[in-house]
Amino acid sequence: MTRIRPVLATMAALAVTAGITVLPALTPAASASASVPNCGGTSLARGFFSGLPMRVPTVANGHPAQWGCNLPPGSSGAAVARLQIDLNACYNAGLQVDGSYGPLTEGAVKKVQRSEHVTVDGEYGPQTASHGFQYSLSGSGQGGGCDYITTP
C-alpha cells in the first residue's frame, strides 16, 4: 500500500501539470487590436510601385517601422487627418479633413475594407493597412497619385 501513494502523488502532479499546460489554450484569446498600439502620428514610407515617399499613420511621428497600428472610431489627431487625406485622394471619400474619426470616416474605411476583401470593422489597423490600402503620394492629397505601402 505504501507504493500506491507515491504513484498516486506522481499521477496527481502530472494531472496538475497537464491542466496548467492545457488551461491557457482554453482561455479566450485577446483581440488582435488589443495587442497593437494605437496610431499617434505620421511618418514617411516608400510607395510599393513608385518608390516615392508618402506619409502614413504610425505609432508616433518619425517611426516608419511602426506603421502597423490601430485607429479605431473615436480617435483624433494627426494620424486620423492623414487617414482622411488618403481616403479622399485614393478612394474619393469626400471627407472633411478634421482629424476626428467619426461615423463618416468609419463608413469610408468600411467601404475600402469591403472593396479589398478584408474584415469589415470600420477600424484602420494592420490588416487594413497591409491588404490593399492605398496612400496618397502627395502631402496634401491633391494630385500625385496613390500607391501601396512597402512593408518596412
What would you call each of these model-derived segments?
Residues 1-33:
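Secretory targeting and sorting signals
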Residues 2-4, 30-99, 143-152:
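Acidic, Ser/Thr/Pro/Gly-enriched interdomain connector segments
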Residues 12-15, 40, 55, 92, ...:
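Exposed boundary/loop context
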Residues 20-30, 54-56, 127-135:
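Short, intrinsically disordered, charge-biased short linear motifs at domain edges
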Residues 25-29, 64, 104-108, 130, ...:
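Short, surface-exposed, charged/polar-biased interaction segments
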